[in-house]
Amino acid sequence: SSAINIVNHGIDLKYSKPYLDFGPGFYTTPSYDHAALAAIRTTQKYNAKNNKNEEPYIVEVDYKPISAMDLVIGSYPRHSERWGKFVLNNRLKPQMLSAYNILEHNQDGKYDICYGEIADGNIINIAYKVNGGQVIPEDINYKEFLKDNGEVYPQQYSFHTLKAISCIKVLSCDMINNKKKYLNARGRR
């Protein structure tokens, strides 16, 4: 599993997917429940695609910044237009970033670390429309889809450079035994 690879070989950024909330990187969350659900879902998709029977794991890490490194950190609080634009921009194809002269993204790893709330499905749907040419970024009304319904989304911390990864220490790696507990809580965040 990827968790076992992290424990045995360290974090390798080449395995990151390209169009994530804060750009390609290694993502963590202080929410055990969210991490467990994400691990279960990812493992289920992997098993279905590859006809495997892997088990989901949670890797617990500790982050200790080294002050001499001068890490560039992006902070993006939820329910702000700045957060919405940044997350959307990271989900756009490079040709869209170029066509609309969008510079505020992290697909190039300009930020070593980013943190903020995890996006819901709304931004993914909007990015799909922008990438498909159905919507242009200037026409997006962020207030419309960043409604504050009182729901609190888990925080995420993402690491995008080797410099940032070097500050992470793996503490433990544990198999998730009670998968039903997390799958039954799907509606909750």
Language-model-detected regions and their locations in the chain:
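Conserved NAD+-utilizing ADP-ribose enzyme module
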Residues: L20-D21, A36, R41-A48, E55, ...
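Short consensus segments that form the blades of beta-propeller domains
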Residues: S16, K49-N50
